[in-house]
Amino acid sequence: PVMNLIDSLGEKVEIRVSTLQKSNSLDAYGNKKAKIYRRFKENKKRSSLFVLVQYIFFSLFTLYQLIRYKPDAVLYYESISAFPAYLYKRFVGRKVKLCIHYHEYMTPAEYCRTGMRLSKLNHSLETSYLYHVATWVSQTNQYRKELFMNDEPQLSEGVCRILPNYPPASWFRKRKLHANEIVKCVYVGSLSLTDTYVLEFCQWIAKQQGKVQFDIYSFNFHKNTLDAIEKLRCPYIEFHKEGVKYSEIPDLFDRYDVGVLLYKAKTMNVKYCETNKFYEYLISGLDVWYPKEMTLLHEMDKSVFAPQIVEMDITQGLFPNVELSPREVDNSSYDRFSEGVYESFMQFLDMQQG
């Protein structure tokens, strides 16, 4: 979402970003429209004390940048990023427009899980102070917004907003020809045996004996996930462990017929998730296959989209019909782009400042 924001608004406003260095091998995102400060490499294998010290230094570095540049507005993503914004808003720049966005929805109970101490501490700063002084607090869809406002009744409708994570207009494919000799499926994103149906889906692929090809692009996965897939020895499954750069996804999707979602949806966050991959598949003209446990997609009016959106009951072994039927999809009615979302966001801020 940050990349789409920069690409959409970089020519209209001065943007500065403070973030950690990523731990994967993909080239870091860059954009001349924004100054991006990357400090301290993300490393989940280090001790909790090391992570805490690194977090404090990162927060102080970010606070220094805020004091130095005196922004008109501050936007942070997720509770884990709240601390430097809290310090700046409370003690330095009290007039700054504070904006908060949640790409993920977390219940109050989830902040108490093992390994969430930093997020829980930051969330206490949000509930005790930041929510009371924020100009904007957003979730990605109406369902999550309603859940969030039920958790945080101190937030008003005027402050709590919706900021979907749609892909940019440059990804748009007005027409999509499905004419592959076999059905080609693609999955992009994180994987685990615990939280996704990737193994069950791969087992089904293996049984199709070449009717379906499945390519996986993921750099964020558990070793046992890769081991389980490789153990199938299926020639129609290819696992690309290097993942794919975000900017290269549109051209990659041109090769495929179907984008697959595989979440088991064990949490409210995933049950009511319009995952960004859903719209990235649709904007490219791909059909979408998803598990029935994804409640929001199950309840959605899918007829407004031209590609076929098909529900799977994976636990019962019910998968889509893979009979090949070449066709052309007229995707011209698709109208959900990041540019419109962030333009509305900026108009809101301008009104607040005016």
Regions inferred by a protein language model and the residue ranges of each:
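N-terminal strand-loop element at the rim of the active site
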Residues: 7-54, 144, 219-225
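Membrane-proximal helix-turn-helix segments that form the acceptor-binding/catalytic region
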Residues: 7, 60-67, 83, 87-91, ...
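N-terminal subdomain of nucleotide-sugar transferases
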Residues: 1-24, 69, 164, 203-210
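Nucleotide-sugar-dependent
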Residues: 192-196, 243-249, 259-280, 289-298
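Conserved donor-binding/catalytic core segment of Leloir-type glycosyltransferases
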Residues: 138, 167-171, 176-196, 202, ...
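A short, active-site helix/loop in glycosyltransferases that binds the activated sugar's phosphate group
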Residues: 115, 120, 127-160, 167-169, ...
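Short His-centered aromatic/hydrophobic patch
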Residues: 76-81, 103
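Nucleotide-activated donor-binding/catalytic signature segment of Leloir-type glycosyltransferases, i.e.
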Residues: 225-258
